[in-house]
Curated annotation (Swiss-Prot):
Protein name, as recorded: 4-hydroxy-tetrahydrodipicolinate reductase
Keyword NADP: yes
Gene giving rise to this polypeptide: dapB
Role: Catalyzes the conversion of 4-hydroxy-tetrahydrodipicolinate (HTPA) to tetrahydrodipicolinate.
Residues that hold (S)-2,3,4,5-tetrahydrodipicolinate according to the record: 143, 152-153
Catalysed reaction equations from the record: (S)-2,3,4,5-tetrahydrodipicolinate + NAD(+) + H2O = (2S,4S)-4-hydroxy-2,3,4,5-tetrahydrodipicolinate + NADH + H(+); (S)-2,3,4,5-tetrahydrodipicolinate + NADP(+) + H2O = (2S,4S)-4-hydroxy-2,3,4,5-tetrahydrodipicolinate + NADPH + H(+)
EC number in record: 1.17.1.8
Record's subcellular location: Cytoplasm
GO CC terms of this entry: cytosol
EC class of the enzyme, as a word: oxidoreductase
Organism: Clostridium novyi (strain NT)
Family: Belongs to the DapB family.
Pfam families noted in UniProt: DapB_C, DapB_N
List of residues binding NAD(+): 8-13, 85-87, 109-112
Length: 252
């Protein structure tokens, strides 16, 4: 049985993970980390991970970027793999994740959905081929409580496109004003409203036709299931930086 410490256990995603873990025979949540103690959860909850004295095999985080330092330190001190599902990290924090992956097993993905990661792989294959004759725009939609924009997933998709194209490209985040669209732009637009779980659309707009890749999450369960699959995968892994691609490939 792989024992999981869940950081952010009292949030919406934390609660969904606590429900979804019942679908995994080989996983159990043995402790939670959150400043809000939800009495409905059936495991001990600590306000800070430094207080946690429960034996575990993996740390799973769905909290906030400012928890990163304590999570990485705990993972290092206890020699535990850490699964980072939080978005909104700064460049400095992303660099720290890379640095720590040399001494502990670290999983990091901007989106835990299998579908999004398959679209990301498709973009690696088609972006360079389409760039010359198509304008590229990304639209992402989320609920009105999401604090980071553009979403980590939109940036993931955008960076995949940028990395696939030999020419220098730039992000135009939220086009505004009176200005002609430049050829080397990749537009990224964020919409916030209601209870939208998550929707991402990549548009290749050419002369006379439009190619669209779109993913819609209908429930947070899709992210919870992906995160728990990542926990299964990371148990016992060697030091290194892992992504959802590694999880997908392991199932083939």
């Amino acid at each position: 049985m792989t024992k999981v410490i869940l950081s952010g256990c009292s949030g919406k995603m934390g609660k969904m993970i606590s429900q979804s873990v019942n679908n995994f025979e080989g996983l159990s949540i043995v402790a939670g980390i959150d400043k809000f103690k939800d009495e409905s959860l059936k495991y001990p909850i600590f306000e800070n991970i430094t207080e946690c004295d429960v034996n575990a095999d993996v740390v799973l985080d769905f909290s906030r970027p400012d928890a990163l330092d304590s999570l990485l330190s705990y993972s290092k001190d206890n020699n535990l793999p850490v699964v980072l599902c939080t978005t909104g990290y700064s460049k400095e924090q992303l660099d720290k994740i890379d640095e720590y992956s040399k001494i502990v097993p670290v999983f990091h993905s901007a989106n835990m959905s299998i579908g999004i990661n398959l679209i990301n792989n498709i973009l690696k294959d088609i972006s360079a081929m389409l760039y010359e004759n198509y304008d590229i725009e990304i639209i992402e939609k989320h609920h009105n409580q999401k604090v980071d924009a553009p979403s980590g997933t939109a940036l993931l998709l955008g960076n995949t496109i940028k990395d696939s194209i030999k020419e220098d490209t730039v992000f135009n985040k939220g086009r505004n004003g009176i200005k002609k669209r430049e050829k080397n732009e990749i537009g990224i637009h964020a919409i916030r409203g209601g209870s939208i779980v998550g929707e991402h659309e990549v548009i290749f707009a050419g002369a006379g036709e439009i190619i669209e890749l779109k993913h819609t999450a209908l429930s947070r369960e899709v992210f919870a299931m992906g995160a728990l699959k990542a926990c299964e995968y990371m148990a016992g892994k060697n030091n290194g930086l892992y992504t959802m691609d590694d999880v997908i490939k392991s199932k083939n």
